């Protein structure tokens, strides 16, 4: 709670005084803290986190060294592979009267969005 070395008796006295003034502190068992900015993220692995309650207003203190990650890398990590089910493929193929291969390709291009895949195939039909 307090930086440097503090005499244990003095620490108890300080904590009592803080409590008398309506201030309470608590160490939190936190494994990771992430700050998300527009262009980067700061990831604190195993930080020391304390919450201080002063007359009902909570203030959080985070101590540790952040790992800074640029946003391009973060977005790549968040990219998720969409699962396309056989039922979705059959539905799109039947609705648009196309082969399952064409339906699957359209679903993949539309990230699994059935309605968007159907509209895409219908537009392609109109163009031909």
UniProtKB/Swiss-Prot annotation:
Q: Which SUPFAM superfamilies match?
A: UBA-like
Q: Does the keyword Protein transport apply?
A: yes
Keywords on record: Protein transport, RNA-binding, Transport
Provide the NAC-A/B domain boundaries.
Answer: 8-75
What would be an example GO MF term here? RNA binding
Q: Pfam families recorded for this chain?
A: NAC, UBA_HYPK
UniProt superkingdom: Archaea
What PROSITE patterns does the entry give?
Answer: NAC_AB
| Biological process terms in GO annotation | negative regulation of apoptotic process; protein stabilization; protein transport
- CDD domains, per this entry? UBA_AeNAC
InterPro entries for the chain: Huntingtin-int_K, NAC-like_UBA, NAC_A/B_dom_sf, NAC_arc, Nas_poly-pep-assoc_cplx_dom, UBA-like_sf
NCBIfam families documented for this protein: archaeal-type nascent polypeptide-associated complex protein
Its assembly, as annotated, is: Homodimer. Interacts with the ribosome. Binds ribosomal RNA.
Q: Which family does it belong to?
A: Belongs to the NAC-alpha family.
HAMAP family from the entry?
Answer: NAC_arch (MF_00814)
Query: What is the purpose of this protein?
Result: Contacts the emerging nascent chain on the ribosome.
Task: Name the chain's protein.
Answer: Nascent polypeptide-associated complex protein
Species: Methanocaldococcus jannaschii (strain ATCC 43067 / DSM 2661 / JAL-1 / JCM 10045 / NBRC 100440) (Methanococcus jannaschii)
Q: Which gene is this protein's source?
A: nac
């Amino acid at each position: 709670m307090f930086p440097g070395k503090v005499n244990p008796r003095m620490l108890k006295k300080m904590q009592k005084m803080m409590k008398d003034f309506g201030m309470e502190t608590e160490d939190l068992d936190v494994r990771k803290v992430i700050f998300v900015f527009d262009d980067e993220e700061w990831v604190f692995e195993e930080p020391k986190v304390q919450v201080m309650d002063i007359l009902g207003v909570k203030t959080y203190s985070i101590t540790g060294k952040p790992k800074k990650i640029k946003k391009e890398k973060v977005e790549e990590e968040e990219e998720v592979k969409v699962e396309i089910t056989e039922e979705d493929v059959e539905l799109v193929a039947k609705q648009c009267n196309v082969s399952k291969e064409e339906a699957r390709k359209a679903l993949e291009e539309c990230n699994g969005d059935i309605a968007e895949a159907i509209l895409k195939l219908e537009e392609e039909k109109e163009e031909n």
